Amino acid sequence: MVQFEANEKQFKLRREDCCLTIDRESGAVSFEPDELKPVARSKENSVTLFGSIKLKKDKYLILATEKSSAAQILGHKIYRVHKFEVIPYRNLLADDQDELDLYNLLQNHLKTGPFYFSYTWDLTNSLQRSCTDEGKASPILRSDKRFFWNEFASKDFIDLIGAHSEVSLFITPMIYGFITSASTIVKGRTITLALISRRSKQRAGTRYFTRGLDENGNPANFNETEQITIVSDEKSEVTYSHVQTRGSVPAFWAEVNNLRYKPLMVANSASMAAAAAKKHFDEQISIYGDQVVVNLVNCKGHELPIKQLYENVIRRLDNPHIHYHYFDFHKECSHMRWDRVSLLLNEIQPELEEQGYTTLDTQKYRVLSRQNGVVRSNCMDCLDRTNVVQSCIGRWVLTNQLRKCGIIGATHPLRSVIPLDNIFCNIWSDNADYISLSYSGTGALKTDFTRTGIRTRKGAFNDFVNSAKRYILNNFYDGARQDAYDLVLGQFRPDVNFRYRLDLRPLTIRCVPYILLACLILFFMTLFSRSSSTILPPSILLILTFLGIVASLYYCFAHGLQFINWPRLLLPSFLRSDMTPEGRVFVINRQLASKHKV
């Protein structure tokens, strides 16, 4: 536990008999033994260090000050952060509007992100990786950099570890994702079911601004989900772990927001993506083993080019460790026949049996078996269809584990153990919502099936509402969310000449939304007003304002790219901004994206 002190010249972080001192003027960090008596472990001034981040003019120390227990797994307490304190080094915040805007981006990211940590367990690594790497290096250096969300913010402190290994005690890797656990008793044995989803910080971002791969083979919306099952009684305890992954279709493609419900699809050829896709799968195979690839995108309409692109990439790679399976989710499960996901399970069952899962003798901390391979699932967003399929795979794995333990019979389903089945459904549904919130801004679709096992009309209506929310958020709000990701993860580093607030679009573009709003207000005021004391007859005014609404909407949709809330720190690779005599306009970068070319 770390104690925090501050004065005008220094920050001090104390832990037992050592201390980190940060000079507020220079930002220099130093380590020294603490000559004072070990600090009392008071909850009032105890903090958890997230790190420090430099904005335009000043640097900021970020401390987690409020937390709650999220889960307890294998005796390790896991916490979720509820409040961060962001403290300026030199108090320059009020001197610059751009600094304030960046500060607000930082604060909003910290407020909305589901951050988890443990003082005693490295959450960035799966149980299998933790057992494999045990004792090889210090915990910080052993952490999985893909999921170490505050690694960039912790850099000043990590750099000191070489000279002072004790500094690692102050650094707490945090993951961005979802963690929960719950227990029940079945046949006199305690069964604990836990779920951990780790979101990768590589190519992190929002739904339409991060798709596909980058040049280094990092996919958008990559998440590792680990299902941990602990079965214990008075004599023994055994732990099972099973890992699945999800990630965007590994190629160069994007959906470009243009105010339409289905954005413009752009994609490069498979030959251009082959090198990056090879990097991606080579890394995945080295970490997880053979890849059972489950592709859930539609085989017709808007999504067809991406299905074809993915299959062309797989053919070009021709890797015997990649096992490709296509499942037309919407066709097979149409008319709410979602039980037909079993068709996919039957198809991949031999590979699931071959890859197995990790088994750990908890009392002896000895690995009895390892998972060899992983199922990598995707749909377009890697959210809704992917959630359903991953939960079905998780159910299949858990059922087999319980049969192995003798909890249920060889032919009995998980639903025969009602308390455990309820836990399973709820944690997988909550997991779906958290992953979806981080990427799309809303909860997941189709969670009524995950939570109850059936598709309902109420669930379909909730999906409609969430789809409408996604449209609004993804078109008009996600730019700032993407900026926050890029700022916190170090993808963009502002300097003293940075300008954030400038809107240099043509005057017409900036005025049309206000004209539309004025016409809407005047139209409804006239429609519902009982007074006729206007310059024009109400009927004429209604016609004119209605025509103004139609003309404004037509203009907006005809120039849709100009009205999107684009990121201001780093534009997506498929977009560029050009300066014209009228102002700055956004255009699709055709050198990087050619429509429907696969």
UniProtKB/Swiss-Prot annotation:
Residues passing through the membrane, by range: 508-528, 535-555
Domain SAC: 106-441
Broad enzyme group: hydrolase
One GO BP annotation of this record: sphingosine biosynthetic process
Residue numbers carrying Phosphoserine: 46
Cellular compartments annotated: Endoplasmic reticulum membrane
GO cellular component, as recorded: cell cortex; endoplasmic reticulum; endoplasmic reticulum membrane; Golgi membrane; mitochondrial outer membrane; serine palmitoyltransferase complex
Protein keywords: Endoplasmic reticulum, Hydrolase, Membrane, Phosphoprotein, Transmembrane, Transmembrane helix
GO molecular function terms attached to this record: phosphatidylinositol-4-phosphate phosphatase activity
Topology of this chain in the membrane: Multi-pass membrane protein
Top-level division of the source organism's lineage: Eukaryota
Enzyme nomenclature, EC number: 3.1.3.-
Disulphide linkage map: none
PROSITE patterns hit by this protein: SAC (PS50275)
Protein name according to UniProt: Uncharacterized protein C19F5.03
Organism: Schizosaccharomyces pombe (strain 972 / ATCC 24843) (Fission yeast)
